[in-house]
């Protein structure tokens, strides 16, 4: 076949296959470092493999989760800070898996952009790989999509997918959650990955650039503080579940805050009473509340406010569970207890958040 001279190429349309190959070469060592029992984390095949038997499971139930990072990505783009976004991507899925009592097994990511910058993309994947290692989760595959015309140069989006497993009969929440059970919370690392459309609106209102010192943490830039990666709760929570046998349920405090997420793990006739002064409100939320003049109930329905994971435990096992979580490096706070639901109100707040700073 005679090749026509000066014919169009895929590169002429804005898609650079060589750049994609360069990215694969950059990330192979990162991906390989996430290998665990059941997965060798070698990429390049048409599908990722996982051997449940090699991972030690006998009668497993699989649990799947998928999520993104939302408009936090826009803050990362505007601030030029990308590594933490990869951590966020993993955390949003694997934290949801541990809520079900499942051990994360493997993760896949999807990266879409207008023009692929291999080095910048590798920075994001480095964060993904770091979070996978910390969660004991193998990165077994992914997709990079260069889509000129759909995304502007410099813009990108991410999605993640993870699968975990638990032995049959050990899934959470348990069916014996009852009035009087204790509600404890694990401290968050910051805003995590929800509410960023409101965050961006508040930053715009403040007039501060992302490279300005953060008013609530002057040793950091505003962008750096807002982009603090979502905390990974996998290892600490799994350890507490296995050590104590007293964990009845968990709620990952994401979009919808306390108000929407805690009821998701409760029987319909039950709710929780939360003592608001016990929530360790982080300075970032105090600043956001002040700058945005955000009502307290709106804060509680939008942000984690300083608590990223809520755990329901047997009332007589609070000390035991707290000891396990503290040994894993968590900051643990007793927030309240399980109560009878009051009609449509499933989360009852007592007192007020400490928003003074």
UniProtKB/Swiss-Prot annotation:
Any one Gene Ontology cellular component term annotated for this protein: cytosol
Known EC number: 6.3.3.1
Keywords: ATP-binding, Cytoplasm, Ligase, Nucleotide-binding, Purine biosynthesis
Compartments where located: Cytoplasm
InterPro entries assigned to the protein according to its UniProt record, in alphabetical order: PurM-like_C_dom (IPR010918), PurM-like_C_sf (IPR036676), PurM-like_N (IPR016188), PurM-like_N_sf (IPR036921), PurM_cligase (IPR004733)
Enzyme class: ligase
The keyword Transmembrane helix belongs to this UniProt entry's keyword annotation: no
Cross-referenced Pfam families: AIRS, AIRS_C
A GO BP entry: adenine biosynthetic process
Keyword Zinc in annotation: no
Name assigned to this protein: Phosphoribosylformylglycinamidine cyclo-ligase
């Amino acid at each position: 076949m005679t090749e026509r001279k000066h014919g169009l190429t895929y590169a002429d349309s804005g898609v650079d296959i060589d750049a994609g190959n360069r990215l694969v070469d950059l990330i192979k060592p990162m991906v390989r470092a996430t290998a665990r029992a059941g997965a060798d984390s070698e990429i390049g095949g048409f599908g990722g493999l996982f051997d449940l038997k090699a991972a030690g499971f006998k009668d497993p139930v699989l649990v799947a989760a998928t999520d993104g990072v939302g408009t936090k990505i826009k803050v990362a783009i505007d601030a030029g800070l990308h590594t933490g976004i990869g951590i966020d991507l993993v955390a949003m899925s694997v934290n949801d898996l541990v809520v079900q009592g499942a051990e994360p097994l493997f993760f896949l990511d999807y990266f879409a952009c207008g023009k692929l910058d291999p080095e910048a993309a590798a920075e994001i994947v480095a964060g993904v790989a770091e979070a996978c290692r910390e969660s004991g989760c193998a990165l077994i595959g992914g997709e990079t999509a260069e889509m000129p015309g759909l995304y502007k140069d410099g813009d990108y989006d991410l999605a993640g997918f993870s699968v975990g497993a638990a032995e049959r009969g050990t899934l959470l929440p348990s069916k014996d959650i009852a009035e009087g059970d204790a509600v404890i919370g694990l401290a968050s690392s910051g805003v995590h990955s929800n509410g960023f459309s409101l965050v961006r609106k508040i930053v715009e209102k403040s007039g501060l650039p992302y490279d300005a010192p953060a008013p609530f943490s002057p040793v950091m830039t505003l962008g750096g503080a807002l982009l603090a990666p979502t905390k990974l709760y996998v290892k600490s929570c799994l350890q507490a579940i296995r050590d104590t046998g007293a964990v009845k349920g968990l709620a990952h405090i994401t979009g919808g805050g306390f108000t929407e997420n805690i009821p998701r793990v409760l029987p319909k006739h039950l709710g929780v009473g939360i003592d608001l002064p016990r929530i360790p409100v982080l300075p970032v939320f105090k600043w956001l509340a002040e700058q945005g003049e955000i009502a307290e109930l709106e804060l509680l329905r939008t942000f984690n406010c300083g608590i990223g994971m809520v755990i329901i435990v047997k009332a007589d096992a609070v000390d035991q569970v707290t000891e396990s979580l503290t040994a894993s490096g968590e900051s643990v706070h007793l927030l309240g207890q399980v109560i009878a639901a009051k009609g449509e109100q499933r989360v009852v707040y007592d007192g007020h958040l400490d928003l003074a700073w």
